[in-house]
A protein has these predicted regions:
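Short acidic-glycine-tyrosine-enriched beta hairpin
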Residues: 66-84
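A generic "binding-loop/recognition-motif" signal
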Residues: 39, 48-49, 67, 83-84, ...
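Double-stranded beta-helix
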Residues: 2-14, 86-118
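Glycine- and acidic-residue-biased ligand/ion/polar-headgroup-sensing regions
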Residues: 48-61, 65-66
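A short glycine-rich, His/Asp/Glu-containing loop-to-beta-strand
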Residues: 7-45, 49
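Short beta-strand His + acidic residue motifs that chelate non-heme Fe in jelly-roll/DSBH
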Residues: 42-44, 62-63, 79, 85-92, ...
Length: 118
């Protein structure tokens, strides 16, 4: 297996914080997510990939199929394909997450966001 890596990963800014792709190869991608204090990701699911999240600094909640699970340092969670999930950082410090994607199609557009009902 030949994996792609760069000397300095590119930071991609989002409204909730940022991410960097650290390493990728056939069937997997490793990213660092940083969720800003008092911020959250959208409620989302993916058709072509599973994800594993491990907290390496800070803490956050993960909403999985309407169940809140608290993640702290060295705690992780597996998110299977087609599972609704949302990362929520209610703390005053950034939450750093190592996210591992596994699947056949590993693109940013493999995402379905829950529609907000007002």
């Amino acid at each position: 297996m030949i994996a792609k890596s760069s000397n300095k990963p590119t930071k991609v800014k989002r409204t909730w914080g940022h991410y960097k792709v650290l390493y990728e190869g056939k069937g997997f991608k490793v990213k660092e997510l940083v969720i800003n204090p008092k911020s959250s990701l959208s409620n989302q699911k993916h058709k072509h990939r599973s994800e594993t999240w491990n907290i390496v600094k800070g803490e956050c909640f993960v909403l999985i199929n309407n169940e809140h699970i608290q993640l702290t340092i060295d705690k992780g969670i597996f998110i299977s394909v087609n599972t609704w999930h949302k990362g929520i950082n209610n703390s005053d410090k950034p939450a750093h997450i190592i996210e591992i994607w596994r699947g056949d199609i590993l693109t940013e557009d493999d995402i379905e966001r829950a529609k907000l009902i007002m």
